[in-house]
Each structure stands twice: as C-alpha cells, then as structure tokens.
C-alpha cells in the first residue's frame, strides 16, 4: 500500500470518527474536550435572546420592560405584513419597521420570506438530503468545520452542549453546502452565519437560507468567501472612496502610515457583524441587511470610521486593524436603537449621493454575474434581487431640445479629445443660417453645440450646489458641467466660423492655469487605461471654448 492510499484511508477514518461523535450526541467527545460543561438550570440565567449567564440575572429594568412591551405591540403589525406580503414587500413601511426592530418570534418567518426559502425547497425537493450524505462521505474540510463549530455561539443555550442537537444540525448544513457550492467550499464565517439562521429556522430552511444569501445578487455575500468573487474589490474600492470623502483626515493618516493596504476593513466588518458584537445588535443589523441588501455595508463602514476617527488618527503600524476591531466592538456596546438610528441616517446620506453601492463590476474583477447599476433611493426595495431602473430626469435639469423635433442633416464629423466624435448638426433647411429663436434666446430653438457620443448621462437626482458635481455611475471620477445658456447659443457662433477654427480651438495645448486646476490633476492621476473612450478628459472649461463662449 503506497503513501497516497494510507493517507486516504487515514482521512476517511478521521472523517467517520468526527461524524460518529455528532451522531452519538451530547458529550461524545474525548475526555480532554475543553468545552464548557452542560448547564442545565436555565431558569434565571438565560436572557431574552437565549444567552446563558453563569450568574443569576438581575430583575428587568424599566427600560428593558418597555422594550419588551414595545416588541409585543409590534408583533401584530408584522403579522399583518406577512399576511399581505405582496403589498408590503416593496413598501417603505417594511424598511422603516426593520430599522425599528423585528420581533423575535416573527424573525424566522420573515427571514424565510425575504430569502424565498419555500420557493427554493419546491424547486429542489430532496436535494438537501443528497448533498448532506455526499458531504459526509467526501468532505475535505470536516476537521476545520468541527473545530469552528466548537467555538460558534457557545454561550447560547442551543449551542452550549458539545455535539448537541444544534451543533449536529450545523455540521450537516456546512457539509451539505461544501458539496453544493464547490467554488466557496467552506470558510470560517459560514459557521457563524448558518448558526444565526439555525436560531430561528429549521435545519433544511437554514441551509437554503445560506444558499440564497450567498447566491443572491441583492446581498452579494459570496464575493467575501469565493476566491473568484468580484464583489470584494468593488465594495473595497467604493469603501475607500466613501471614507476618503467623509473622513479625509483619517484616510490621510492611514495613507501616510501605509496602513490601508495591510488588511481589508470591509472584510473585518463582516466578521464583526457575525461574531464581534452583542447578539442582539448582530441580529438587528442582519435584519436590516436582509431587507436592504448590500446597500447596508457602506453605511456600516462609514459609521465605524466616523466613530473611530480620533482613535484611527493615532493608530500606528503595530496591528492597526486588530485595534480597530477591538475598539469598534467596545464603542458600539451601547443602546441598539442608537446604533440603528445612526445607521439609518448614514444610509439616507449615502443613498442621496449615490455612494451606497459601487459601480458595476468589470469582467476581469471576478467570475460573478455582472452587478446591476445602482439605482436611486427613490425606488422601492425589491426582495428577489431585481432592481428597478434609475428614475428619469426631473424638470430641474431639462435637456434643451426642439419642441417639435425637426429632421437634422449632418454637416461634418470632427474627432475630439477622448475618442468622441462631434457632429455639427442643424435642422434641415437651416444649414449655415442662424435661427431667429436662437438669436432671441428662445428655448424652443436651442440645441446642444457639442454632441459627445461618449458623454455620460447627467445624474439628475442629486442635490447640486454649483455647476460642477460628481458623477457616481462611472468608475473614473468624471466632472460634467450642466448646460448653460452659452452652450445653447453656440450655433449662432458656429454659423459664422468654419469648422477648422473649432478643431484648432480644441486641439490647442492647455495653459498652465488649466493644468493647475484640482479637477485636471485629480482626473489625470486617476485616469487608467480601460476599454472604450476615456471620459476623464471631457472638461468643458472656459479655456477650451472659442472666443465668445
């Protein structure tokens, strides 16, 4: 027998021994098992979340009693929403109530509806049992799974007993998912996520909840556990932009100390949400995450950096993100309603600026499906991962067009900076003749002077102060200027000047004052070779226009 066969038989025997311990049940481990001893008297030592305390709990305070009464009163409202789910699943009321708090006895049915568990069970009858049996026979990570299960939610009454019922169910779920999704296989965080589902869902429902959570585009959690997932890079880039915009001093210190590239703070936050804070706050944040989707990750990151601003500016190179994790947990060990209030405010602010979601991922960023274009917050929240199109442009940014669109005849085509093409167009019958309406500044006779084929659509749902504003739908930081009256009157000047003068004006070298502007320096620094025309050079600055603009 060669070495490979010996190793294979040894792994098979080890796998069978681990499974046999879980089949025997409670206290079936070795004598040197260091797990906590069973604590059977749970009368006055268990809180309302199921956490077992070694000492007897004090009587309820007035605030805790008020919170329990409030949760009981909210139960009927959530039951009504579940009874008429088609009406409430896309409503603002669902989001508002999720931030206020989801009753514990409603959390299981609500999670099941949000993740479409029943639909998955109907589409895959008996598949969970098949995956579970295959995982028992061929799992390659069963030792890691067993080791992680021994430290998962051990203070909870469901998982306190080693090799108990809930630990056995957790083992089955993780083995089945390893077989179901070989790309992810098993990661340490999956044991904590599945354990949270097992607190409120049966075994098979918890498995399909885990499947939906990682497979749904709405939550995009697979990128944090898959080696080929493109979610992490997109969220990481967006996080760096959001934090750098709101906490410039903090990120400046991190860049100066070369701390930003040492560890991913976003992945660190995911682990904090799983097993780093109190169970009550963890459950409430997961409620919001399941309702809102991946939009909740950016606000949580922003809140963390905002709270830790003073401490992060004093962080040295010695374990920066380890300190960040510990201090984040200590800081947010406070009232849950306060945390959710700050989270809601941050969500509204980032959504208003379209900073809650990163731009669509490029094909080279991973094998995951292409990410949908982030929609405005004015849309309704969808529960099946579908996203509505962004709202149309409001009346604040009307595009100057003809009232009755006349036919147009192209005069000439001129290449312009950035690979765009400018077509000098006039209404048929008016080539070279100034329009009387244009001379008078009439709106119905105005059209755009420059027809940029690669110009992005203006983000018309932002609160704009001044003519310059960020466009968040593109990865490059492009600055676009709103259409001014001079742009509308441009054809009057164009009718009097040949096209050669227009080309020479755009081909003229930039002056020193142009190169010294912060917009030009910033865009030239961020401009990288990409597929398609580069948008970073499309500045409609005064120095680039011919005289008279």
Curated annotation (Swiss-Prot):
It is a lipid-anchor. InterPro entries: Rab-GAP-TBC_dom, Rab-GAP_TBC_sf, Rab_GAP_TBC_domain. TBC1D3 is encoded by a collection of very similar paralogs with multiple copies of each paralog, some human genomes encoding well over 50 copies depending on ethnic origin of the donor. Residues 350-426 are annotated as: Disordered. SUPFAM superfamilies: Ypt/Rab-GAP domain of gyp1p (SSF47923). One of its GO terms (molecular function) is GTPase activator activity. The gene is TBC1D3B. This is TBC1 domain family member 3B. Acts as a GTPase activating protein for RAB5. Does not act on RAB4 or RAB11.
């Amino acid at each position: 027998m060669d070495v490979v066969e010996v190793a294979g038989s040894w792994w098979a025997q080890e796998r069978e021994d681990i499974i046999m311990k879980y089949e025997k049940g409670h206290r079936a481990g070795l004598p040197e098992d260091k797990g906590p001893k069973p604590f059977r008297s749970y009368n006055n030592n268990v809180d309302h979340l199921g956490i077992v305390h070694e000492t007897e709990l004090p009587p309820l305070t007035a605030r805790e009693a008020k919170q329990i009464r409030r949760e009981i009163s909210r139960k009927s409202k959530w039951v009504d929403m579940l009874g008429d789910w088609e009406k409430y699943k896309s409503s603002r009321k669902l989001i508002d109530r999720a931030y206020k708090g989801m009753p514990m006895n409603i959390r299981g049915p609500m999670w099941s509806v949000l993740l479409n568990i029943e639909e998955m069970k109907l589409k895959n009858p008996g598949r969970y049992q098949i995956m579970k049996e295959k995982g028992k026979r061929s799992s390659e990570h069963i030792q890691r799974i067993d080791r992680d299960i021994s430290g998962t939610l051990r203070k909870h009454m469901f998982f306190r007993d080693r090799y108990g019922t809930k630990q056995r169910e957790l083992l089955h779920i993780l083995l089945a998912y390893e077989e179901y999704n070989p790309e992810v296989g098993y990661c340490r965080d999956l044991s904590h996520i599945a354990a949270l589902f097992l607190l409120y869902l049966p075994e098979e429902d918890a498995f399909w909840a885990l499947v939906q959570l990682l497979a749904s585009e709405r939550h995009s959690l697979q990128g944090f556990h898959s080696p080929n997932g493109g979610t992490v890079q997109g969220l990481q880039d967006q996080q760096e932009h959001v934090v750098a915009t709101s906490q410039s001093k903090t990120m400046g210190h991190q860049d100066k100390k070369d701390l930003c590239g040492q560890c991913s703070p976003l992945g660190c936050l995911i682990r904090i949400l799983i097993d780093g804070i109190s169970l009550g706050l963890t459950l409430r944040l997961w409620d919001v995450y399941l309702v809102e989707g991946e939009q909740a990750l950016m606000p949580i990151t922003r809140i963390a950096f905002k709270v830790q601003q003073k401490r992060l500016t004093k962080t040295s190179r010695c374990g920066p993100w380890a300190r960040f994790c510990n201090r984040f947990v200590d800081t947010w060990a406070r009232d849950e309603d306060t945390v959710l209030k700050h989270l809601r405010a941050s969500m509204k602010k980032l959504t208003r600026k379209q900073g809650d979601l990163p731009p669509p991922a490029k094909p080279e960023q991973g094998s995951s499906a292409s990410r949908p274009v982030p929609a405005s917050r004015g849309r309704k929240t969808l529960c099946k991962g579908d996203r509505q199109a962004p709202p149309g442009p409001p009346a604040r940014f009307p595009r100057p067009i003809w009232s009755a669109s006349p036919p147009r005849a192209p005069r000439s085509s001129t290449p312009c900076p950035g690979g765009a093409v400018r077509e000098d167009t006039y209404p048929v019958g008016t080539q070279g003749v100034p329009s009387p309406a244009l001379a008078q500044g009439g709106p119905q006779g105005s059209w755009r002077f420059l027809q940029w084929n690669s110009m992005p659509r203006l983000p018309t749902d932002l609160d704009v102060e001044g003519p310059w504003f960020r466009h968040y739908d593109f990865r490059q930081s492009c600055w676009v200027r709103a259409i001014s009256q001079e742009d509308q009157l441009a054809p009057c000047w164009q009718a009097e000047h040949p096209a050669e003068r227009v080309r020479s004006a755009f081909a003229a070298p930039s002056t020193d004052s142009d190169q010294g502007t912060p917009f030009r320096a910033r865009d030239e620094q961020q401009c990288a070779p990409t597929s398609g025309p580069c948008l970073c050079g499309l500045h409609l600055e005064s120095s680039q226009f011919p005289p008279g603009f």
